[in-house]
């Protein structure tokens, strides 16, 4: 099993907020493709005097097969385009179910 963490920006690169409808579409697609997800927290930080509260972490637990990895890579490319981002951080961690 694998846990994938998607760090979803809530603002465009110019600092303007991403429309809530786009974030809703992301959630709907994740639910349709993977069957479930969790949103455990938001991330905030300061940089060069500016305050940022703009990252929503979404977790998905699923098999770690190649099909899932391919779908996530395709999903990431769509996110980068629709949210106008240079990159979207997606990490993976092996998990063991007890």
Question: Language-model features: where?
Answer:
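Positively charged, small/polar-rich N-terminal and surface patches that mediate targeting and assembly
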Residues: 1-98
């Amino acid at each position: 099993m694998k846990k994938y963490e998607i760090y979803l920006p809530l603002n465009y690169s110019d600092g303007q907020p991403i429309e809530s409808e786009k974030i809703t579409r992301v959630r709907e697609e994740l639910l349709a493709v993977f069957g479930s997800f969790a949103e455990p927290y938001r991330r905030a930080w300061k940089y060069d005097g500016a305050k940022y509260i703009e990252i929503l972490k979404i977790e998905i637990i699923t098999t770690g097969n190649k099909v899932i990895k391919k779908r996530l890579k395709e999903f990431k490319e769509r996110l980068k385009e629709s949210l106008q981002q240079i990159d979207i951080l997606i990490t993976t961690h092996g998990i063991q179910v007890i």
